[in-house]
Amino acid sequence: MKFVDEVSIRVKAGDGGNGCMSFRREKFIENGGPNGGDGGDGGSVYMVADENLNTLVDYRYTRHHEAQRGSNGGSTDCTGKKGEDLFLRVPVGTTVIDASTQEVIGDLVTPGQKLMVAQGGWHGLGNTRFKSSTNRAPRQTTPGKPGDQRDLKMEMKVLADVGLLGLPNAGKSTFIRSVSAAKPKVADYPFTTLVPNLGVVSVDRWKSFVIADIPGLIEGASEGAGLGIRFLKHLARTRVLLHLVDIAPLDESSPADAAEVIVNELTRFSPSLAERERWLVLNKSDMVMDDERDERVQEVIDRLEWEGPVYVISAISKQGTDKLSHDLMRYLEDRADRLANDPAYAEELADLDQRIEDEARAQLQALDDARTLRRTGVKSVHDIGDDDGWDDDFEDDEDGPEIIYVRD
């Protein structure tokens, strides 16, 4: 199944129906007067969050969506039928953006939530509306108003409580397999994970949280290298980040260097996301001797000047994973309780969330702009003149911002 998390579409609300000009005509009634009815309102376009969807692939192939036009008014004061509204179903966690102004129209974060993205046109008036004491036979009507038309960009972010960060082959997919029922692909080569994977971690019988695994980051990811930069946005709505570090890399590289790369790339992508609660998880502890393991752990802590929680685990043998899962559940419960009872804390987190969203969107927009420049053969925006044939035609733009990966 194709995983698509960004698409561009055009929506058009229905036009309003025209008013009718008609006069009453009956036997023995010489001057029956006007009886033209109003037109019907045009249908509006809504986005609806559907918890059964996890990709925007349907909108990759169908880019134009139009609601029904309102019917024209009829004689004998008959009002035209209202156009049917159009409901476009999208995954929960979808952000809808006006492509022309970059204004965020809304976020769909709860199942069943509806968002109007295009208002239907107002109905036209029939000639009955213009009857007066001085104008007994009006021949005036009004046409229906056109419905809104908008070019939209939709961005989907997975909704998870915990997000995993790390270099390729740090053991993120193995970790999510060990603590949940999710079965992402695991192999001994980089970039095994190509799309985000979600898993539900059940701690007790009635307690659970959702964890998200994204493709690994590499050095230079904030400039577009590798796969992870596109998927960092999926961590924007997580509540806590787990930074996984491989302390027994096959290439015998320094775990401290690897940990530092992730921190640097995260900070370059979004300084505010780097402020999110983050725990250090040192993986593959069963592959080194105890003395060497402790030395490598301390080296990572010293290099990062780490002061937060530290966990030493082995995901494949599940050493330390139960304690980590219980601690995460406890943190999430305490966080939710504090959010409900501490308005200042809630306001602080809301401000942080907004800054993360803004910075992530700005980074991704910059990457899209750079890709557009490369496609047109322009090295810099400063090289574009007023009449250089800059392509703003939505119809011909087959390379919108959608990114497609194939889920195994």
From Swiss-Prot:
**Which parts of the sequence bind GTP?**
166-173, 191-195, 213-216, 283-286, 314-316
Q: Which domain of life is it from?
A: Bacteria
Q: Where is the OBG-type G domain?
A: 160-333
For this UniProt entry, which residues form the secretion signal? none
**Entry keyword set:** Cytoplasm, GTP-binding, Hydrolase, Magnesium, Metal-binding, Nucleotide-binding
EC number, as in UniProt: 3.6.5.-
Output the Gene Ontology cellular-component terms.
Answer: cytoplasm
Keyword rRNA-binding assigned to the entry: answer is no
Q: What class of enzyme is it?
A: hydrolase
Listed GO MF terms: GTP binding; GTPase activity; magnesium ion binding
- Localized where? Cytoplasm
Where are the residues of the annotated region Disordered? Answer: 127-150, 382-408
Start-end of Polar residues biased regions: 129-143
Pinpoint the Obg domain residues: 1-159
Cofactor(s) needed: Mg(2+)
- UniProt lists compositionally biased (Acidic residues) regions at 385-401
For the biological process aspect of GO, one term held by this record is:
ribosome biogenesis
Instruction: Classify the main location.
Output: cytoplasm
- Record-listed Mg(2+) binding positions: 173, 193
Which HAMAP family does this entry report, sorted A to Z?
GTPase_Obg
* Function of the protein: An essential GTPase which binds GTP, GDP and possibly (p)ppGpp with moderate affinity, with high nucleotide exchange rates and a fairly low GTP hydrolysis rate. Plays a role in control of the cell cycle, stress response, ribosome biogenesis and in those bacteria that undergo differentiation, in morphogenesis control.
Q: How does it assemble?
A: Monomer.
Q: Which family does it belong to?
A: Belongs to the TRAFAC class OBG-HflX-like GTPase superfamily. OBG GTPase family.
Q: What is this protein called?
A: GTPase Obg
Its organism's taxonomic lineage begins at: Bacteria, Pseudomonadati, Pseudomonadota, Gammaproteobacteria, Pseudomonadales
